[in-house]
Structure formats: structure tokens, C-alpha cells
């Protein structure tokens, strides 16, 4: 039995009782990485020397009264979250040798909580993708079946947890990039409310949509991690100065009287029968615990995919303009003049999907098209947000599938961008509205790959979605299933 089959609270107790050491946890992580990483390919950079040195320091503090629950816990960090002195590439050749000079706020908070960073995790380049096949280095595979994708863009973050390489990880979610891979890999992934977690030190893709969040084996562990990284940050003007509650207090298993909304759009056209049936079965479980549900409508969700790609690509076009060989990124040697420097650096440094998004965004922002595309997309975004607010006036949570289908095979959709983009039709509306959502395991498809249940909450009401997710988790055994890699 792996140490990582235990929860954070169980490991914390074992540490305090000196049944195990922090070094044991770190070595467990690196041993597992040595065993499976050649197949999974979840990591881009390992932090072995520093991690072992920190473990030795923390071993001397075991048993101290001020040791928090995350003391000594091994974590993986998505490679678009900067880590001082530890290579951060965004899975792009553009940043292949970038060593940050500061820590992201979330990394700083976890360091203060005495977690240990095991390494940096693979992803779709600059977080643009749904399968991890867009990494500029190599594709991560799904631990449940290496022929399948782990999802994206936080595919490395989800795969590392599912494979038992780390206890938990950090990902980022712009249109579903935490929840979708969590669903595909059979783990728990939360996208917090926009502004709940500081984005300082997150390499920007789409600044009005990006959020950092936790990926874990269980809901309880997820709540511990969010508790540690949440809060206002003076380094991020978009972080919200709203009190962070106690997310653990509501994990009672009680959902009696809870009002659940189920959008008909989330169970209709484009959603596979397996995903639909798994959600209906989950609703039956929650009904048996005293919750009630009704069908509702989110009428503008059908426009979410187009709206998202116009807004996110426009913001990416602006954000990625800094990678030009002068300010950031590699510099092409194949230059005769300044224009060659810009053009060749970006042509050689960016992958195809990043170039596609930049071109789309530049077009949407260009003179003569701004009003017709970008401005119109922002107006539709407001309508989508209003749909959520109207539903939440009468219901506590919204529930549906995380993804339309289970994971698909490597190479199956990479040459068809529109089919690939459609994997996120159920997660994208949440980002556009800025509300929180969690994915928890809720079943398996005919291909024996995991399915995820998405629970969506009101702004800054992560506590309620944790309560529902935990109650469902405790009433079922899906979270106990492990990839057999």
C-alpha cells in the first residue's frame, strides 16, 4: 500500500506520531516517479536535490505544535506557475530555459505551509489544449490506460495524482483545464471563483478567465489545499478581498434540503449517453440523502464555446506578445533585421495551437472586426453570467457532467481543432461566469475510463460545492478506485 493511499489528515497524524518521516514521503514520490514516469510523462522538471534537503530540515521539526496539516506533504506544480530557481517552461520551447527569480503567491503560501515541491508538471503549451498533446516537449498519458489522453491543459497535474506520483497538485483552469483532466483521470479538481486565488506568478493565457486550483485524490484533501492558497493578494489586483471561510467545517455528509438545478442543455445534444446516465445516477444518490433537483435552462450556454474562443484568444494574443526574443523567451539566431528577430523567434518558439489562437485573437481585435467579434463576445458573456445568476436565485448548486464523454485515445482528435474544442462545452460556461466548480469521479465509460460529475456553485461559495461533493463521495466508492498502472 502506497503512503499516498492515505489522506492528508491520516499522513499528518502518522508524521506527528513519528510513524513516518517527511523523507519517507519524498522518497515515496520519487520512487513512484522512477517506476512509472517513462510511461506517464507527467513531469517536465524534477526538484530532487532541493526537495530532499527540505525534507531533511522538516524531519527535525516533526511533532512541533505549529506544524499545519500540509506539513511535509509532496506536491506537483503545473509548469505555468513560476517557481524561484526551478525551471518554468509553460511546456513551450519559447521558455525552455526560463528560471524564474520569484515564486508565485500560491507557491509562496505552500512553502510557508511547509509543503515540498517535487517538480513541475507537463501541460498543453501555454495552457492551450484539451489533451496534453500540445506540449512542446512530449505528451502525458492517462494512467488508467496509456493509449488515452489525460485531458488538458493540466494533464500532467491530474495524471501525476492519479498515478500516485504526488499526493496532490496545482493546476490552472481557463476553460476547464483543471476539471476536464480531473474527470478523465478519475481524481478531484476544483476551479475556484475568479478572484478567490491569486494569479500572481501564473503565466497569463487569458487574464479574465485564468484561475489556479487544486487537484487531489479526495474532496477533503482538495479543501485543505484550497484553504491554504486562497485569499486576497496585493500583487494581484483581481484577487478578491472576501473572507475565506472554513471549507472543512461543511464536510458533514449532510445535503438534506439542498436544492439542485440540472440544466437541460447539459444533458442534451452533444452529451454522450454514458455521461448523461452517470449524472442521473448521481442525482439519485443525492436524492436518497434528502436533496431535491429540478431541470432548468441556461439558454445562452449554446453560445459559450464561440464566446470563449473569441475572448480567450484575444487576451492570449495580447498576453503572448511579450514573447518576442527581446523581453522574454528564446531568441532566434536566424535573423538579418529586427523584423526577422520578432518573426523567426515566434515562429520557432511557438507550437501550432498557440499560433492558431494568436492568429484568431489578433483577427478578433483588429480594426473593423473588434465590434463584430470581441465586443459582441463580451456582451454574450454577460448574458451567460446572468443565466447563472438567475438559476442561483432559486437553487443552491448546479449539477451536470464534467465532460460529454470519457477520455479519448491519443491522436484521435489532434488534427480536428473544432472536435477537440468541443470537449470543453460543459466547463467553459463556468469560466465565463466566474463561478466555482468541482469535478468528482462518478462512474466509468464502456472503455473503462473515468467519468466526472461537475458541481457548480455561487460566487465565492466553494463551501457548498465541497459539501455536496464530499457527501456524494462518501456515499459512493468511485474515489477509492485507482489506476492499475
UniProtKB/Swiss-Prot annotation:
The keyword Transcription regulation does not apply. It catalyses: L-glutamyl-tRNA(Gln) + L-glutamine + ATP + H2O = L-glutaminyl-tRNA(Gln) + L-glutamate + ADP + phosphate + H(+). The keyword rRNA processing does not apply. GO terms for cellular component: glutamyl-tRNA(Gln) amidotransferase complex. One of its GO terms (molecular function) is glutaminyl-tRNA synthase (glutamine-hydrolyzing) activity. Belongs to the amidase family. GatA subfamily. Heterotrimer of A, B and C subunits. This is Glutamyl-tRNA(Gln) amidotransferase subunit A. It comes from Bacillus cytotoxicus (strain DSM 22905 / CIP 110041 / 391-98 / NVH 391-98). The lineage of its organism: Bacteria, Bacillati, Bacillota, Bacilli, Bacillales. The gene is gatA.
Amino acid at each position: 500500500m502506497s503512503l499516498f493511499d492515505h489522506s492528508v489528515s491520516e499522513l499528518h497524524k502518522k508524521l506527528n506520531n513519528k510513524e513516518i518521516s517527511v523523507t519517507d514521503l519524498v522518497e515515496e514520490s520519487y520512487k513512484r516517479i522512477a517506476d512509472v514516469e517513462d510511461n506517464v510523462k507527467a513531469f517536465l522538471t524534477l526538484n530532487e536535490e532541493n526537495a530532499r534537503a527540505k525534507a531533511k530540515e522538516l524531519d527535525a521539526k516533526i511533532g512541533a505544535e505549529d506544524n499545519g496539516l500540509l506539513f511535509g506533504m509532496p506536491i506537483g506544480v503545473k509548469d505555468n506557475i513560476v517557481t524561484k530557481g526551478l525551471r518554468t517552461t509553460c511546456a513551450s520551447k519559447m521558455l525552455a530555459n526560463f528560471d524564474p527569480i520569484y515564486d508565485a503567491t500560491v507557491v509562496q503560501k505552500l512553502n510557508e505551509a511547509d509543503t515540498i515541491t517535487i517538480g513541475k508538471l507537463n501541460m498543453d503549451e501555454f495552457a492551450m489544449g484539451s489533451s496534453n498533446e500540445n506540449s512542446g516537449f512530449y505528451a502525458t498519458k492517462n494512467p488508467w490506460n496509456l493509449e488515452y489522453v489525460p485531458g488538458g491543459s493540466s494533464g500532467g497535474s491530474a495524471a501525476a495524482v492519479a498515478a500516485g506520483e504526488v499526493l496532490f497538485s496545482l493546476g490552472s483552469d481557463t476553460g476547464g483545464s483543471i476539471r476536464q483532466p480531473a474527470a478523465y483521470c478519475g481524481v478531484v479538481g476544483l476551479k475556484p471563483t475568479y478572484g478567490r486565488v491569486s494569479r500572481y506568478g501564473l503565466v497569463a493565457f487569458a487574464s479574465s478567465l485564468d484561475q489556479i486550483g487544486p487537484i487531489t485524490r479526495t474532496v477533503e484533501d482538495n479543501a485543505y489545499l484550497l484553504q491554504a492558497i486562497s485569499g486576497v493578494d496585493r500583487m494581484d489586483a483581481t484577487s478578491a478581498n472576501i473572507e475565506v471561510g472554513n471549507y472543512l467545517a461543511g464536510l458533514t455528509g449532510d445535503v438534506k434540503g439542498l436544492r439542485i438545478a440540472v440544466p437541460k442543455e447539459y444533458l442534451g445534444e452533444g452529451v454522450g449517453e454514458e455521461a448523461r446516465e452517470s449524472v442521473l445516477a448521481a442525482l439519485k444518490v443525492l436524492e436518497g440523502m434528502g436533496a431535491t433537483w429540478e431541470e432548468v435552462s441556461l439558454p445562452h450556454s449554446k453560445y459559450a464555446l464561440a464566446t470563449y474562443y473569441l475572448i480567450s484568444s484575444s487576451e492570449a494574443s495580447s498576453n503572448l506578445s511579450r514573447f518576442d526574443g527581446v523581453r522574454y523567451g528564446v531568441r532566434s539566431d536566424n535573423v538579418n533585421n529586427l523584423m526577422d528577430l520578432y518573426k523567426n523567434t515566434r515562429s520557432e518558439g511557438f507550437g501550432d495551437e498557440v499560433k492558431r489562437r494568436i492568429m484568431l485573437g489578433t483577427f478578433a481585435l483588429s480594426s473593423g472586426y473588434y465590434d463584430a467579434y470581441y465586443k459582441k463576445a463580451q456582451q454574450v458573456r454577460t448574458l451567460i453570467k446572468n443565466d447563472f445568476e438567475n438559476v442561483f436565485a432559486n437553487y443552491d448548486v448546479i449539477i451536470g457532467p464534467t465532460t460529454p464523454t470519457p477520455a479519448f485515445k491519443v491522436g484521435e482528435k489532434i488534427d480536428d481543432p473544432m472536435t477537440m474544442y468541443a470537449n470543453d462545452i460543459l466547463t467553459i460556461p463556468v469560466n465565463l461566469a466566474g463561478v466555482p466548480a468541482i469535478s468528482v469521479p462518478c462512474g466509468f465509460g464502456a472503455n473503462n475510463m473515468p467519468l466526472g460529475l461537475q458541481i457548480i456553485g455561487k460566487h465565492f461559495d466553494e463551501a457548498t460545492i465541497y459539501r455536496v461533493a464530499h457527501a456524494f463521495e462518501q456515499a459512493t466508492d468511485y474515489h477509492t478506485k485507482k489506476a492499475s498502472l
